[in-house]
């Protein structure tokens, strides 16, 4: 088992990071009925850990007895029937799913499937809360239609169902949904908090950490606790005992994006654009989110660019990220940004060096 799963806090009392939020959640569910909740914050900040600990606080050990199912449904959509398939993670009292996995059909997931689950109260309550919890991941990636359907579902089945929504950015969630939830902002942990967790993991694994080693891992983690723990485990596999100057390797996909940035700086041509497109597609196939690719690519380019170009390149990166949110095929928008950058950079080189 990966350390990131092995040492994930199982209850609100054992949470190391965000202790204040954990105690407020504990008080909330013990004193009154839990409202709909919206957890939002950067990836790796600990949203999912808090949600799972909260479920255990509400339902006890039964919340940990989960099973993974690939479920299929037939949904009537006017004159035709749509076949939907989605992976769910469920226990007696809660169901977890990611409706945005259904793509443009996400509104049918929200309309029909959540409705079906919300109608059924948990049978085996044993004196616990008489409602079922639906955990919806990546709510910020739902289409507008799906979010409107979700709002109606929240109102209609609030007596038998509570929704816990999870997303990276609340700005992409409609005000109608946000106003019906208690919004819980989960900030990225500080470097000091990450160091504290790494030292806790190292102690549990009986590892000796050199002076400043945990701080170096925390610094390279970009304030992602998940990434920091994975990096520590990777370093343990690569070389132990640790050394003070041990290299903390970047992730493979980050090195690959750095190569793409170097290619874009070296040559600006249709041939190179085609090669870059292939590399970007390879990253997408390996499940690297398109917005993460674009953000990392911009980061690598800014390290190499002249200061007078940085503002314009940032503008176009933001423009194509926005276009990517509105469209369906992410590869088109990343490729468009690459082409735009090549055009800007080539014109800059011509005007500077002739």
Swiss-Prot record:
UniProt GO cellular component terms: nucleus
GO molecular function: ATP binding; ATP hydrolysis activity; DNA binding
UniProt-annotated binding residues for ATP: 41-48
Keyword Nucleus: yes
Domain of life, source organism: Eukaryota
One Pfam family of this chain: DNA_pol3_delta2
GO biological process: one example: DNA replication
Database matches in CDD domains: AAA (cd00009), HLD_clamp_RFC (cd18140)
Keywords in alphabetical order: ATP-binding, DNA replication, DNA-binding, Nucleotide-binding, Nucleus
Record localization: Nucleus
InterPro entries recorded: AAA+_ATPase, DNA_pol3_clamp-load_cplx_C, DNA_Rep/Repair_Clamp_Loader, P-loop_NTPase, RFC_lid
Protein family according to the UniProt entry: Belongs to the activator 1 small subunits family.
Quaternary structure note: Heterotetramer of subunits RFC2, RFC3, RFC4 and RFC5 that can form a complex with RFC1.
Function: May be involved in DNA replication and thus regulate cell proliferation.
Name the record gives this protein: Replication factor C subunit 3
Organism of this sequence: Arabidopsis thaliana (Mouse-ear cress)
